[in-house]
Amino acid sequence: MNHNIIVIDLEATCWEYDRIPPGQKTDIIEIGICELNKSTKAISNKQSIYVIPERSKISAFCTELTGITPKLIKEKGIRFEEACEKIRDEYHPEMLTWAGFGAFDREQMMQQCDYLGIENPFSGNYLNIMHLFRNHNGLYKMMGLRRALNALNMNFEGHHHSGADDAYNAARILREIL
């Protein structure tokens, strides 16, 4: 029995005031990913997988928010299908629970897989860490990643809106509430 949970955080093309330009759609541009071992509580295999957007361009607003530039994507980006294959090869996620902080990551992954007609590399078993945190702490309202860390007396490690760093910090929260 595998004791790992895959934790992801996606960064996607975005625009100021959520105004999507005509003819463009939100595309995943980074898959931040790591593994949490439920038994040992160790977090490992943290990485960023940069993805070439197929239906949109990276806006200046998106670069300012995420630090992801068109140049970075040109140098390190791979096609979404290749990113999914890399995840399958390195994490073997099809039988593991996967998690993210909120519903966006699950929904965007499913939408992009559906659009491209490829199989989602992850299992059907998804944990919404934001909901788990709220329920674990008996909170009425949801809170963001930074506030959840603060509530646990933990500092954010890395850069906010870096997929790998956000996934790692989400895994730290999950580790505390499991």
Language-model region placement:
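Metal-dependent phosphoesterase core characteristic of DEDDh/y 3'-5' exonuclease domains
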Residues: 2-3, 24-31, 35-68, 89-178
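Short glycine-aspartate micro-motif
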Residues: 5-7
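Short acidic, Gly/Ser-rich segments with clustered Asp/Glu that frequently serve as metal-coordination loops
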Residues: 10-20
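Metal-dependent phosphoesterase signature
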Residues: 63-86
